[in-house]
Amino acid sequence: MMKTVKHLLCCAIAASALISTGVHAASWKDALSSAASELGNQNSTTQEGGWSLASLTNLLSSGNQALSADNMNNAAGILQYCAKQKLASVTDAENIKNQVLEKLGLNSEEQKEDTNYLDGIQGLLKTKDGQQLNLDNIGTTPLAEKVKTKACDLVLKQGLNFIS
């Protein structure tokens, strides 16, 4: 009788171990499935209220047209935005912006009325490929910051070329 009780007890312990292992395995499977699904969705959904990873990556890998200003008034505003956000050397961005504005003949009163310039100050880049990119709305992920920095660098070079 004692052997039978001992045997039943061992079977019960083994069964509970197997059941709990199965539960843990199912739990792990669910967790992995959820993580894989979330990772897959990251490429198509927006990040932190910004753009998708795929869209940001595309902006970085596409030609300079995608992140260059289509007019110098907008470029001057973007330079102001970049300096304010510390995405470019404040001194360089300010100096080039001022020289661009001077060459364009935009005094401070005209600047207040020029929509391209005002859009640029707010971070709205009107690109050479006909798109509008709001640098304030693409997010704050490291990838989004790279896009912003690249845009500022390209517009800074545009400004230098314009005043040369």
UniProtKB/Swiss-Prot annotation:
Pfam families: DUF2501
Keyword annotations from UniProtKB, A to Z: Signal
Listed name of the protein: Uncharacterized protein YjjA
Classification via NCBIfam families: PRK11667.1-1, PRK11667.1-4
Annotated Gene Ontology cellular component terms: cytosol
Claim: Signal is one of the keywords in the record: yes
Signal sequence extent: 1-25
Annotated organism of origin: Escherichia coli (strain K12)
